Amino acid sequence: MGKKKLLKNYRTTNLINTLEQVDYVVLAPGISFIKNKNLIKYKNKIITDIDLFYLINRNVKSIVITGTNGKSTTCKVIEHLLKKNKLNCFLGGNIGTPILDFNKSKKNYIIIEASSFQLFHSKFIRPDFAFFLNFRNDHLDWHGSKSNYFKSKLKIFHLQSKKQFAFINKKFKKNFLKNKFLSRLITSKQREYKKIKIKIDNDYLTSKINDENMSYVYTFAKLLKISDKSFISSMKSFKGLPHRFEILYKKNNITFINDSKATSFAATEIALSSIKNIYWILGGLPKKNDKINLTTYKKNIIKCYLIGKNISFFEKKVKGKINYSITRNLKNSIVKISKDIKLKKLSNKYLLFSPAAASFDQFINFEKRGEEFKRLCKTYARKFI
């Protein structure tokens, strides 16, 4: 159907008539409910693809994971853990295969990454294991407020029964209890995990957010009666996801890290707090209401390199706080860093691309941005270092 014909058939009046006649409307996550008056009127009919999955599959063991940062990596870690321990599983939702492509034959568990957009509309999501990893300011342009964003995350627990498990950050325990959710509240075994993590020695799991989220995974492993020996062995072989604190290679005490997925400062903070002696590439399309405060992290940053079409915005944030250069694009940044990095004699140095901004000013998505960074590192940085 052509665009003109589609618009003719689905003008506002026709759309409202359609909404009145159907039982449910499966809404795409990118559509802002708050900004559409017609959708608000029919909010009780709006569901998501995950809801539809639960309506179709009533007797499947499900693990649903949400949180501002680290959802995808945590999903992949749990998938890896289950497979290594000979437990069949399916990974879907916002990562991997679309959730409605799930085939339940011979699958012990389904792992679902759920966004705040999906949880906002959720009416049938009832995980056996629900993880609310963390919460930071993000997606406020979609949700309208921090309060709405937080309430969306909490909806992961709404339909759980007394036999199901809720993994939640200690900071939000009061919120959980206030809502009188029925599920069994599980707090992560952080102390126990710290004792064994030294035996894992996996660069892909070294960032502070992964450290925090791994304690949830360890706690989950204990519920499944997976031994420490099996857990350590499984985690040693885990390979991280592309563009998420992705360690490209190490050379002459210099580590190259691709963190292109960091599209907000809240995400970049994790990288800045996890390492020191950083040559940091920053810039892109800043998110609405994103606050950049370098007070805590400036001691870890040797120099910053500003890229993208919003240089003035980022320059105001770093000027007078850290040393910086305006390099405008990734190629110039890598060439400049390759020269600057030789000036400091330090045992360990990090070339970190964690832009703290969306990619759309120069790239179509964060994946393309990350791939370009990797290509340039291979082409230029290795020649100079």
Predicted regions and their residues:
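Active-site beta-alpha connecting loops in nucleotide-dependent enzymes
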Residues: M1-K5, L241, S260-L330, A356-K368
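Short acidic low-complexity segments
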Residues: K8-Q21, N329
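Nucleotide phosphate-binding/pyrophosphate-handling subdomain across enzymes
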Residues: N88, D203-I301
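Adenosine-cofactor binding site in Rossmann-like domains, unifying the SAM/SAH pocket
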Residues: G2-N14, E192-N202
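Residue-level signal for inorganic ion chemistry
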Residues: V25, I65, N94, L133, ...
